[in-house]
Structures are given as structure tokens and as C-alpha cells.
Amino acid sequence: MKFIPEITLLLLLFVHSTQAKGKRRKCPEGAWSEGKIMNTIMSNYTKMLPDAEDSVQVNIEIHVQDMGSLNEISSDFEIDILFTQLWHDSALSFAHLPACKRNITMETRLLPKIWSPNTCMINSKRTTVHASPSENVMVILYENGTVWINHRLSVKSPCNLDLRQFPFDTQTCILIFESYSHNSEEVELHWMEEAVTLMKPIQLPDFDMVHYSTKKETLLYPNGYWDQLQVTFTFKRRYGFYIIQAYVPTYLTIIVSWVSFCMEPKALPARTTVGISSLLALTFQFGNILKNLPRVSYVKAMDVWMLGCISFVFGTMVELAFVCYISRCQNSVRNAERRRERMRNSQVWANGSCRTRSNGYANGGSVISHYHPTSNGNGNNNRHDTPQVTGRGSLHRNGPPSPLNLQMTTFDSEIPLTFDQLPVSMESDRPLIEEMRSTSPPPPSGCLARFHPEAVDKFSIVAFPLAFTMFNLVYWWHYLSQTFDQNYQ
């Protein structure tokens, strides 16, 4: 009793094998083998056009097996396809022969011996037939003379790249099929009802295949009209990578460059370091992106963004230079005011006396001056007659003054003397006073002295973010709207 399950299983297997043999088609007696049929066909076959009166109708379809990445530098992409051709050749019909099957799988060595439309991809850069391990070609001959050929191909085909919208761009790549040897009077090419099929979802590192389409055209060559079949693949770039690797770092770099507005105007080394570091960082990021793109003469969306960001960082450097300039201008104004105050404290007053407007000098607000010059025996002034201004704003001559030739005078007159009104005894003081006035430059001309560095920084810390926000609104609205329009089309 313990062997009942094993016996039941054996009986079921026997019944199933018997039913399978009953369903198997039996060849009639006297049926020819495939080799004998092919030898008979090829013995009388001539490799000429199948139909001399009309053009041969060739139907084509492709099955997309896989795709490689789209290369922007070389402007091409790689694709693996199963390329199928179907046509009718009455000379290969074996319906009149006693065949066991209605179709025969031919050896690939017989393919060069039969007529073919010689269809090729005229725009491919490279096309190879897979060999793993043998050549991946299948030829099936039907009893009515229909020939079905399938090649497993690896194709490298060009793409029409337009990078104006990069990295929000949409690219198209085209495969073009033609008969290399026969024009449309001999061979007509047609797409099958389901011309292109995807064997699996296509996922590329940088792109999504969003659409594909087929069409047929007729082109005029010097030797006639030729049928041309085209399949167009549309790819949309995944820009998430560039958002993370390009846009976010530039945002951070721009914000870092604005930190200099919060520093003191006197912190020139720190502000310069921040600005130059931000500028170098943006330049490095821009170059890192451009090295993976072809050299095109038009402006890309990424170019607009990077150049705009570089302009904003450069603007912070210009603002720094402006702040430094007006800071120096303010210092010059303050220094000029101090020097003018010292000049007012050392003016020459009427009647040969000098009165200071400050209250810190000795001698009751008077200075000592040589009122009557003395001369030596040669009639020349003594070397002690050279006037000098003391550190307290007093004017005296070199050398120890003599009581005989000194006179102290004080007046209440506030009318200053001009050089023409100076007494003869003070004519020798004219160069000294002129030198004093020439060493005190006038304040800077123009209205830059009215600005204050702190006010410029406060204005910049508001104006730069507002301008950058406006730039962002215009930039993203322009390019994203064009991207949506392309998707809609």
C-alpha cells in the first residue's frame, strides 16, 4: 500500500506522454527532409529580383532590446535592436514539394546565396552583428516563398543635439533605413503595423525616453527615387543631477559672497578673501560642467545661469572697491579739515601781528615776529632772519632773537593780510606760508564724499538679494516654460 503514490505518478506521466505523441504532427509518408528541399530549391534558383514586373515590397520592424547612454561630446547614442525584414520571393516557394513543415529555418551560410533588399542604416556610425558565440542571424523560409530575416544588431547612431536649453533640454536621435542597392522602382520599403516595440522599459542615466515615432519619406537621388524609413527617439534630460551638482552650490556661493556686506568697511583683507574665494568657486564649477559638453557657439541655459552668478559675485567685488574708495575719501576730508584748522590757527593778521584763534597758546594769544630786520655789514639780511613757525603756531626767525630787533604787538583786528599787504619785513615769510598752504590739499571734488561706507553696505545687503531674486524669477520662468511647451508638443 505504501507504493500507491509512486504508481499513480507513473501512470499520470505515461498518459501525458501518450497524449503529447498523439498531438504531435506526423509527417506524411514520402515527405522530403529540409536539406533535400533546400537543395532542390537552390539548384534552380537565380539571385535576381524576385518580381521583374513590379517592385518588391519589403516590410520592416525593429524590437528595441537595450539602449546605451547618449553622449553629448560625440553627439551619438548606442542601441541594441532586433532588425526584422520580410519580403516575398516566389522562386523560393516549396509549396509544390512534399514538405513535412510549412517553414524551414535556413542556415546562415545560405543567406548570401539568395536575393536580399540590402537594407542598411545609412546614418549609423557603426553597426555590428552580435556574435555570442555564433552570429545572431535567423533566416526563415515559408512555403509560399516569404523570407523572414532577423539580425541582432548593435548600432551607434548620431543625434541632432540642441543644447540651448541645457540642462532642461530634449534631444532626438534618428535611425534611417534605406535599400543601398535598389531604388523605389525595384524595392519599396514599408513599416509593419507595429513598427517599433520595446522589449523592456528603457532607462538611461541622464535621459528618459519619452516618445518614439516612425515615418516614411521618398528621396530623390541622381539615379532615381529611394524609399527611406525613419524612426525617431525623443529623450528628455533628467536635470536632478544638475540641480544638486550645479544650482544648489551656486546658490550657496552667492549667499556666502553677501557675508562681506556684514563686515566692517575696514576689514578689507577678510572681505577681499570672501569675494575672490566665491569667484574662484563659481569659475571652477562652471569649468567642471563645460568639460563634459561639446564646444558650441550658442549660449546655453547653464551659461546664462553661471555667468549671471559670476556677475553677482563680481558685483560684490565692485561694491567692495567702491566702499574702500569712499572710505579713503572720507579720511581725506577729515585730514583736510584738520589741516585747514591748523592753517586758521596760523594766519597772519593785520599790522604785522599774528593772532591765533585757538586758546591754548602762550603770550596772551600773541606770537613773536621780527618787525624790524637787521642787516650785516654787507647789506644782506642776517641768517637769523629766516622765519619759522613754531610748534605752537608762532612765527619767528632762526637763531636766538635779540631784544633789540624784536617787538611784540597785539591787535584786535580780525582782518587777515594778503601777501600783497604783508610788510616788507615779512616778505621773506611768503615762501614758508605758501608751503604750509600747499601741503594741505583741498577736499576731494564730486559728491562721493557725501556717501558713507556703512550706508552703502546697508543698501547692498538689500539690493543684491532683491536683484538675485528677480534674476531667478526671470530665469526659471523662461526656461521651465519652454520645457513645458516641448513636453506638450
Curated annotation (Swiss-Prot):
Organs and tissues of expression: Expressed in a subset of muscles, and head and tail neurons, including RME and GABAergic ventral nerve cord neurons. Expressed in AIY, RME, RID, RIF, ASI, DD1-6, and PVN neurons.
Annotated binding of serotonin, by residue: Y180, W226
GO molecular function: ligand-gated monoatomic anion channel activity; serotonin binding; serotonin receptor activity; serotonin-gated chloride channel activity
Protein name: Serotonin-gated chloride channel mod-1
Keyword Zinc attributed: no
Gene Ontology biological-process entries: behavioral response to starvation; chloride transmembrane transport; chloride transport; locomotory exploration behavior; positive regulation of fatty acid beta-oxidation by serotonin receptor signaling pathway; regulation of locomotion; sensory perception of chemical stimulus; serotonin receptor signaling pathway
Region forming the signal peptide: 1-20
